Amino acid sequence: MKFGETFTEYLHGEEEWFLEKCRFVEYKKLKKVLKKCKTCNSTKSDDGQIIPSATSSSLSDSCECKACPWCDQMFFEELMKEATDIAGFFRSRVRHLLHLHVATGMQRYMIRLRRCFTDEKQALVQEGQILIQYITMNAIAIRKILKKYDKVHSSENGKNFKLKMRAERIELLHSPWLIELGAFYLNSGLDNVGNFKNSFGRVACENLNEDQPVLKLMLPNSIELEYDLTCAICLETVFNPYALKCGHIFCNSCACSAASVLIFQGIKAAPRHSKCPICREAGVYAEAVHMIELHLLLKTRSKEYWKERMMNERSEMVKQSKMFWNEQTKHMIGY
């Protein structure tokens, strides 16, 4: 079965009720745009519209032109909008799902009360399954259509567009929220996601107490993702991790140190000109994501290490707080 048929079957399958309220890649529409692209063998009408020539039907669909303004305007503009909407929807739904899982205070009490009447945990797990399938199928659709674009135009514009998506932080399978979703499954005791009614792959966390801790996601369609859980600053397993806007993950204390802010002030107090220690991109601290599920995973899977790091961070935080307020006192009273 071709991917177009598989994608259509997915859109009209069991999750159709969910997909009706969210954006997805218009795979067939974009494919039709590529099929109509005969730029090298077309003429222009009097009003400037592109019309395929009579001889174009005898030629192959492959276009030798490196640039195709008509196709590019319709194709990349639409695809960028779709990818942005998909990434935004995925981010908002995962954030809502995880907020329910780690809720505190009165909201936590109300959720526990609801669980007396409904299986709330099962509902969260089911939505997580749907979101994994949603992001995976759309990521495959984007990859397939960009590959087809490069084949039709004999160019590398599709590859360049993927790099642009990564720069714009909308590459679907490189989202910190996907890591959080994987950690959520492990925290729920579901090391094998395929235990449910559909095959959604596997999630595994390996070598937590060794030199190279990793989180592995084996998604549908044989997609394997591996995320390094080593902080690039302290070279240890990330503790109280934050993902910067650029996607790099650091310990909270390490990121604060790199941005020249105190731990108790928080990572989002970093100046706008602060740069990522790895890629050196500025302005990545303001939209940092607190990886709460990943932090809980490390707390349960590596208890001794977590306790040691917690004591060290608290000690350093108290030390920094004392120094800060001593300096403030001296500044106020003059000595």
Swiss-Prot record:
List, for all copies, the residue spans of the domain called SPX.
1-163
Q: Which taxonomic lineage does the organism of this UniProt entry have? A: Eukaryota, Viridiplantae, Streptophyta, Embryophyta, Tracheophyta
Q: Could you list this entry's UniProt keywords, alphabetically sorted.
A: Metal-binding, Transferase, Ubl conjugation pathway, Zinc, Zinc-finger
* Species this chain originates from: Arabidopsis thaliana
Q: Which GO terms describe its biological process?
A: protein ubiquitination
Source superkingdom: Eukaryota
Show the domain comment: The RING-type zinc finger domain mediates binding to an E2 ubiquitin-conjugating enzyme.
Gene from which this protein is expressed: RF178
Signal sequence, renumbered to the chain: none
Record flagged with keyword Transferase: yes
Q: Does the keyword Zinc apply?
A: yes
Which principal EC class is assigned to this enzyme? transferase
Family per similarity comment: Belongs to the RING-type zinc finger family.
Q: Any idea of its EC number?
A: 2.3.2.27
Zn finger regions (RING-type) covering which residues?
Answer: 231-280
Q: What is the reaction catalyzed?
A: S-ubiquitinyl-[E2 ubiquitin-conjugating enzyme]-L-cysteine + [acceptor protein]-L-lysine = [E2 ubiquitin-conjugating enzyme]-L-cysteine + N(6)-ubiquitinyl-[acceptor protein]-L-lysine
Which Gene Ontology molecular-function terms are recorded?
catalytic activity, acting on a protein; transferase activity; zinc ion binding
What is this protein's name?
Probable E3 ubiquitin-protein ligase BAH1-like
Protein's pathway: Protein modification; protein ubiquitination
